[in-house]
Amino acid sequence: MAPKKKKKVTGLIKLQIQAGQANPAPPVGPALGAHGVNIMEFCKAYNAATENQRGNVVPVEITVYEDRSFDFKLKTPPAAKLLLKAAGLQKGSGVPHTQKVGKVSMAQVREIAETKKEDLNARDIDAAAKIIAGTARSMGITVEG
């Protein structure tokens, strides 16, 4: 049997799409169409993979190969979105260092850090929590504890 040839990568697409709600309309359609990917095939696969995370924005990294096939890797939801959900807010502060818009506890920050640990370049949970706390501060959310 001949050894498997590694497929040649022709593109890498990064998108942030609502979980379970990918459709061929912009921004998904044009981004994938430019690389010749079967858009409906991706939408069905993405929606099936993110069905249990509805309500979150789930970033996805799509690797497109020479033969127009693709693989995709799901990431964890953005820290900013998780912080807004934890604080019960719609959006962060326009002037974060002077106007605070919400509060989260250190326990909530650690919980978000646990969720995001695989995507953060932190060695332990304390370092990951510091990264998340910094994101919260830059959004005008106070971290208590």
Swiss-Prot record:
InterPro entries (UniProt xref): Ribosomal_uL11 (IPR000911), Ribosomal_uL11_bac-typ (IPR006519), Ribosomal_uL11_C (IPR020783), Ribosomal_uL11_C_sf (IPR036769), Ribosomal_uL11_CS (IPR020785), Ribosomal_uL11_N (IPR020784), Ribosomal_uL11_N_sf (IPR036796)
GO cellular component: cytosolic large ribosomal subunit
Keywords carried by this UniProt record: Methylation, Ribonucleoprotein, Ribosomal protein, RNA-binding, rRNA-binding
Pfam families: Ribosomal_L11 (PF00298), Ribosomal_L11_N (PF03946)
UniProt PTM comment: One or more lysine residues are methylated.
Record keyword Iron present: no
Complex formation: Part of the ribosomal stalk of the 50S ribosomal subunit. Interacts with L10 and the large rRNA to form the base of the stalk. L10 forms an elongated spine to which L12 dimers bind in a sequential fashion forming a multimeric L10(L12)X complex.
Family affiliation: Belongs to the universal ribosomal protein uL11 family.
Protein's UniProt name: Large ribosomal subunit protein uL11
Annotated organism of origin: Corynebacterium glutamicum (strain ATCC 13032 / DSM 20300 / JCM 1318 / BCRC 11384 / CCUG 27702 / LMG 3730 / NBRC 12168 / NCIMB 10025 / NRRL B-2784 / 534)
Gene field: rplK
